[in-house]
């Protein structure tokens, strides 16, 4: 019974020696302890350990396993973090700070037993061991590429699939499950966009924009539930695109998907004898612009029936390709304020072979040169080139030209000599 009483005292003594070894190791790294004191302290600690019959764990293992233990000799910042003595790095745990100090000291305790490889980080050694075992746990979700390191997989995604890693809050769903959903969705969608993928679950919900509330109730055979179910339906007549090109959060993508549904509807109130001419002259077209990476603009025109009015129908060109500007007239609706070329009575899968023809009534006309301008700014700049006294006199240099051809050649040469 008398031999068991000193055991608590011996345990406290051994624990104090254990802390002394840790403190001594850190001081040895920082260079604050001389070599003679180091040898004496280590020899004394080893002698006491042999006398007590206890085997103390190594310093390297103890630092990793007891990251929450505070070690004397480290300076703390104002927020309680442990600060590095060589730079401004600070960490809450001791283990991470010790790993950081190895960058300055060059210490590499983690060594490979198959080759001379050594590293200051245990995770680097684990990645190196996969080169010996041939294990490749990281797989690309878009192709059959496999690698042994996460950084190689990120480099492969940026180089092959043009994907940029997105910084933000992590989703509750796993990345593999989200990639499966994105791949399934890209196989159904037919409109291409640049790769802008957000792994948050709310981004998969297609919301109805507020600026569509003004005219969705007036479009025939289009209901609200059909727009809300766009994420589950497959638009007809879509162009086959690369599955990598997917955009979820852009409202323009929602408009283009709605345009695909509008184009799939059969036209109403149309004269079968003359398909190129609108039957009702009071119908106003509605255009939805769809920008793409190839700079190809495609729009879908849907007929919106208006109330009957006693006004006489206005003559329209017989071609199917038209351009509508914001100055279409007082009868234009506020929703059709976007000036985009449209292709009438055609599916989105049919590319436009030629540029749309401008309506002469909607353009700005220079009566001197007989030139039409679709933009008011270009028209104003052009009219400023004509002189005030003579229409074919250059307003820049005062050169008098014979006719409109000589006037155009003068500005094409750009030789404005002041007289």
UniProtKB/Swiss-Prot annotation:
Region Disordered: start-end pairs: 36-55, 262-284, 297-356
Keywords assigned: DNA-binding, Isopeptide bond, Metal-binding, Nucleus, Repeat, Repressor, Transcription, Transcription regulation, Ubl conjugation, Zinc, Zinc-finger
Zinc finger intervals, C2H2-type: 82-104, 110-132, 138-161, 364-386, 392-416
Domain of life from the UniProt record: Eukaryota
Residue ranges with Low complexity bias: 297-311
Residue stretches of biased makeup (Polar residues): 262-273, 332-349
SUPFAM superfamilies: beta-beta-alpha zinc fingers
Cross-link (Glycyl lysine isopeptide (Lys-Gly) (interchain with G-Cter in SUMO2)): 5, 185
Locations listed in the record: Nucleus
GO terms, molecular function: chromatin binding; DNA-binding transcription repressor activity, RNA polymerase II-specific; protein domain specific binding; RNA polymerase II transcription regulatory region sequence-specific DNA binding; zinc ion binding
Main location (coarse class): nucleus
Keyword check for Repressor: yes
Record bears the keyword Zinc: yes
Subunit-level organization: Self-associates. Interacts with other family members; IKZF1, IKZF2, IKZF3 and IKZF4.
Family to which this protein belongs: Belongs to the Ikaros C2H2-type zinc-finger protein family.
Entry function: Transcriptional repressor that binds the core 5'GNNTGTNG-3' DNA consensus sequence. Involved in megakaryocyte differentiation.
UniProt note: domains: The N-terminal zinc fingers are involved in sequence-specific DNA binding and heterotypic associations with other family members. C-terminal zinc fingers mediate homodimerization.
Other observations noted: 'Pegasus' was the winged horse in Greek mythology.
Protein name (database record): Zinc finger protein Pegasus
Gene that specifies this protein: Ikzf5
